[in-house]
Amino acid sequence: MTNKGYFWVVASLVLASAAQVLMKSGMLALPSISMTHWPSLSTLMAGWPVVAVLVGIICYGLSMVCWFMVLRYLPLSRAYPLISLSYAVVYLAAVFLPWLNEPMSLRKNLGVLIILLGVWLVSRDAQATK
């Protein structure tokens, strides 16, 4: 039963991370909106940026469905820390995907390493107490 839980954790993690990347990609390509000038609805709804944002929202919804399955199969104290792995996945995607092209820095890398270390420590503790 635990393996099913980890499958659903990975599915939730992948979908939530994909949602972030899709929504960011779509929002970068949409025209700017200011309080004084609103683009027409046809301008906002045209093309792939809106599709990327909508697919990202769908990915979030599917991620939540996967999370419900995680809650069925894993203890919350073991499952919830694993979701923080999405921070590392999204950071790496933002750095390595050419259209996002976000800068890598030592400080951010250390932050991601601390997150990974924390997940490892919590997971190890959960396994040791079993």
UniProtKB/Swiss-Prot annotation:
Cytoplasmic compartment spans: 1-6, 71-79, 124-130
Subcellular location: Cell inner membrane
Keyword match Lipid metabolism: yes
Domain EamA: 55-124
Bilayer topology annotation: Multi-pass membrane protein
SS bond list: none
SUPFAM superfamilies: Multidrug resistance efflux transporter EmrE
Domain of life: Bacteria
Keywords, ordered alphabetically: Cell inner membrane, Cell membrane, Lipid A biosynthesis, Lipid biosynthesis, Lipid metabolism, Lipopolysaccharide biosynthesis, Membrane, Transmembrane, Transmembrane helix, Transport
GO biological process terms on file: lipid A biosynthetic process; lipopolysaccharide biosynthetic process
Transmembrane stretches, start-end: 7-27, 50-70, 80-100, 103-123
One example GO MF annotation: carbohydrate derivative transmembrane transporter activity
Primary location recorded for the protein, binned into one broad class: membrane
Membrane topology, Periplasmic segments: 28-49, 101-102
Known function: Translocates 4-amino-4-deoxy-L-arabinose-phosphoundecaprenol (alpha-L-Ara4N-phosphoundecaprenol) from the cytoplasmic to the periplasmic side of the inner membrane.
Oligomeric and partner information: Heterodimer of ArnE and ArnF.
Family assignment from sequence similarity: Belongs to the ArnF family.
Protein name, entry field: Probable 4-amino-4-deoxy-L-arabinose-phosphoundecaprenol flippase subunit ArnF
Organism placement in taxonomy: Bacteria, Pseudomonadati, Pseudomonadota, Gammaproteobacteria, Enterobacterales
